[in-house]
UniProtKB/Swiss-Prot annotation:
Name of the protein in question: Lysine--tRNA ligase
Biological process terms in GO annotation: lysyl-tRNA aminoacylation
InterPro entries per record: Aa-tRNA-synt_II (IPR004364), aa-tRNA-synth_II (IPR006195), aa-tRNA-synth_II/BPL/LPL (IPR045864), Lys-tRNA-ligase_II (IPR002313), Lys-tRNA-ligase_II_bac/euk (IPR034762), Lys-tRNA-ligase_II_N (IPR044136), Lys-tRNA-synth_II_C (IPR018149), NA-bd_OB-fold (IPR012340)
Organism of provenance: Geobacillus stearothermophilus (Bacillus stearothermophilus)
Predominant localisation class: cytoplasm
Cofactor remark from the record: Binds 3 Mg(2+) ions per subunit.
Protein family: Belongs to the class-II aminoacyl-tRNA synthetase family.
Length: 494
């Protein structure tokens, strides 16, 4: 639609607004009591014959947005849409009277109306409502996008999500499914004895992950604060305090790039369980995700893009070093210097930064050469100690940690470990991170004295888990971009 056409439409719609007022009707309506939603009408009455509907004279009241409209004269049809779908209405001047029929005639696509009437089927067998009362509820002053040309622009769908929800039933379905996924997640955890808690979103120290924070300032306290990059360290304090199984589903903020997999604010599930380790958390993770898929989708076998993914437990478990050996043919089990690791990286075309040591290079091999090949659910465990400052070292090979990440369709979906509960070791790890920061790693962890003090009171052996909720929703709704599963994703200025 050209700018000129839009301006014409806006003018015409404002003129119609005046006409509605001249008829003594409030163009922005009032409360309307519905008996049914569109989908319920099909469920209840869709199988009845024309004759049965005629005989039963079923009275209903529905409300929604006009999506199609045809026929004028003394009778017309329209489809109105509510959250569940569309139902056809049939409006006849003889049934509703002159004033209400005039209202119907001047109604535009996008206007919101309420109707009362009886159920019937048209000649072609379409379930419809024969309207006896037509009530105007909201005048739309802007036209909806044209059905077949209007909302193909993906950027407009993200910027004006309300139009996307009106015009694209698939989009609405995705967001309803998202809500069901989070409800199912909560139900599972609540029924397994986990306590849902809420912890601060503004932190004095940015910790719990390798990421750049958003920085803000508290005027009254005159102090710098960081929007949380993880929920982890506050939940661990609660484990110290004796709350043995805790979780939080909440927003996390990372001041980083935007991509099909990354948005600066996103939703995480973080969970901690005292007296558990990372292997217990593996079992919990596969059972939780399989439960959600079964409850929400009715199956653990799902389509994602070109892949058929089987979420049925038990999932594959593979050490990071073995994964590199399997997919690249390089063996990092043998002892080697940082320099030898660097040479291997050069040989295999793996890019490494100046501050990187043996463990970082192992991780780079995995991320650059293996990660995107892991289509079926796979737990990759045994991450190097250098990239896991909050995880317990593996007792058999202290170069690695008791940590895992879950990969499905080549993407990380969860991160978990046997938590580091030794405050002396934790302090040393933080000190190593500070050295990395000095060498140019701006994602290295800061020193957190308050957290160290909490650990010194004694935290029991603990297993912890973080699941990216948005990525899980992408997987379970077959959505290619994170922006397809966020109602209002972050966008650049127009």
């Amino acid at each position: 639609m050209s700018h000129e056409e839009l301006n014409d439409q806006l003018r015409v719609r404002r003129e119609k607004l005046k006409k509605i007022e001249e008829l003594g009707v409030d163009p922005f309506g009032k409360r309307f009591e519905r008996t049914h939603k569109a989908e319920e009408l099909f469920e209840l009455y869709g199988d009845l014959s024309k004759e049965e509907l005629e005989e039963q004279q079923i009275e209903v009241a529905v409300a929604g947005r006009i999506m199609t409209k045809r026929g004028m004269g003394k009778a017309g049809f329209a489809h109105i849409q509510d959250v569940t779908g569309q139902i056809q209405i049939y409006v006849r001047q003889d049934d509703v009277g002159e004033q209400q029929y005039e209202l119907f005639k001047i109604s535009d696509l996008g206007d919101i109306v309420g109707v009362r009437g009886t159920m019937f089927k048209t000649k072609v067998g379409e379930l419809s409502i024969k309207v006896s009362s037509y009530e105007f509820l909201t005048k739309a002053l802007r036209p909806l996008p044209e059905k077949y040309h209007g909302l193909k622009d993906i950027e407009q769908r993200y910027r004006q999500r309300y139009l996307d929800l009106i015009m694209n039933p698939e989009s609405k379905k995705t967001f309803i499914t998202r809500s069901l996924i989070i409800q199912s997640m909560r139900r599972y955890l609540d029924s397994h004895g986990y306590l849902e808690v809420e912890t601060p979103m503004m932190h004095a120290v940015a910790g719990g992950a390798a990421a750049r924070p958003f920085i803000t300032h508290h005027n009254a306290l005159d102090m710098t604060l960081y929007m949380r990059i993880a929920i982890e360290l506050h939940l661990k304090r609660l484990i110290v305090g004796g709350l043995e199984k805790v979780y939080e589903i909440g927003r996390v903020f990372r001041n980083e790039g935007i991509s099909t997999r990354h948005n600066p604010e996103f939703t995480m599930l973080e969970l901690y369980e005292a007296y558990a380790d990372f292997r217990d958390i593996m079992k919990l993770t596969e059972n939780l995700i399989a439960h959600i898929a079964t409850e929400v989708l009715g199956t653990t076998k799902i389509q994602y893009g070109e892949h058929l993914v089987d979420l049925t437990p038990e999932w594959r478990r593979l050490h990071m070093v073995d994964a590199i050996k399997e997919y690249v043919g390089v063996d990092f089990w043998r002892q080697m210097s940082d320099e030898e690791a660097r040479e291997l990286a050069k040989e295999h075309g793996v890019e490494v930064a100046p501050h990187m040591t043996f463990g970082h290079i192992v991780n780079e091999f995995f991320e650059q050469k293996v990660e995107d090949k892991l289509i079926q659910p796979t737990f990759i465990y045994g991450h190097p100690v250098e990239i896991s400052p909050l995880a317990k070292k593996n007792p058999d090979d202290p170069r690695f940690t008791d940590r895992f990440e879950l990969f499905i369709v080549g993407r990380e979906h969860a991160n978990a470990f046997t938590e580091l509960n030794d405050p002396i070791d934790q302090r040393q790890r933080f000190e190593e991170q500070l050295k990395e920061r000095e060498q140019g790693n701006d994602e290295a962890h800061e020193m957190d004295e308050d957290f160290l003090e909490a650990l010194e009171y004694g935290m029991p052996p603990t297993g912890g888990l973080g699941i990216g909720v948005d990525r899980l929703v992408m997987l379970l709704t077959n959505s290619p971009s994170i922006r397809d599963v966020l109602l209002f994703p972050q966008m650049r200025h127009k």
